[in-house]
Swiss-Prot record:
It holds the Pfam family Ribosomal_S7. The gene is rpsG. The keyword Oxidoreductase does not apply. It comes from Helicobacter pylori (strain ATCC 700392 / 26695) (Campylobacter pylori). One of the primary rRNA binding proteins, it binds directly to 16S rRNA where it nucleates assembly of the head domain of the 30S subunit. Is located at the subunit interface close to the decoding center, probably blocks exit of the E-site tRNA. This is Small ribosomal subunit protein uS7. Keywords: Ribonucleoprotein, Ribosomal protein, RNA-binding, rRNA-binding, tRNA-binding. InterPro entries: Ribosomal_uS7, Ribosomal_uS7_bac/org-type, Ribosomal_uS7_CS, Ribosomal_uS7_dom, Ribosomal_uS7_dom_sf. Belongs to the universal ribosomal protein uS7 family. One of its GO terms (cellular component) is ribosome. CDD domains: uS7_Bacteria. One of its GO terms (biological process) is ribosomal small subunit assembly. GO terms for molecular function: mRNA binding; rRNA binding; structural constituent of ribosome; tRNA binding. Signal peptide: none annotated. The keyword S-adenosyl-L-methionine does not apply.
Length: 155
């Protein structure tokens, strides 16, 4: 383990909206350091959302992240030879990173042809409590609910 906690680096806002969460999403989406490609995909997806739903793309994006954000998750805890799935609350920073990760995973698994369409549709689905990313959150919450009996093993 490291001696000191690593400092949390400050992220700059994205060039269009000045939003730090959008920057994190762009960075998480980027492959092989191709940031400009990731930015184009996200901004085109926001435009597509505005065309389809009439709502602002950034608002749908924020609503989707909020809806996919998990409140509890399960962590494995070994007690006397048995491994228990212990439900624990999720820190705010982890909630954000998990919601970003789940939306991107769900987006990449969709079968529309263009990444722009996939992202736009997944964000709209997540904002309206549908889609694979929202289902992932529901599954995590169900696991935590099912293992509520082991909550006293918290650490």
């Amino acid at each position: 383990m490291r001696r000191r906690k690593a400092p949390v680096r400050e992220v700059l806002g994205d060039p269009v909206y000045g939003n730090k969460v959008v920057t994190k999403f762009i960075n998480k989406m980027m492959f092989d350091g191709k940031k400009s490609v990731a930015e184009k995909i996200i901004y085109k997806a926001f435009n597509k959302i505005e065309e389809k739903s009439g709502e602002k793309g950034i608002e749908v994006f924020e609503k989707a992240l909020e809806r996919v954000r998990p409140l509890v998750e399960v962590r494995s805890r070994r007690v006397g030879g048995a491994t228990y799935q212990v439900p624990v609350e999720v820190r705010a920073s982890r909630q954000q990173s998990l919601s970003i990760r789940w939306i991107l995973e769900a987006t990449r698994k969709r079968n529309e042809r263009m990444m722009v369409d996939r992202l736009a549709n997944e964000l709209m689905d997540a904002a309206s409590d549908k889609g694979a990313a929202f289902k992932k959150k529901e599954d995590v919450h169900k696991m935590a609910e099912a293992n509520k009996a082991f909550a006293h093993y918290r650490w």
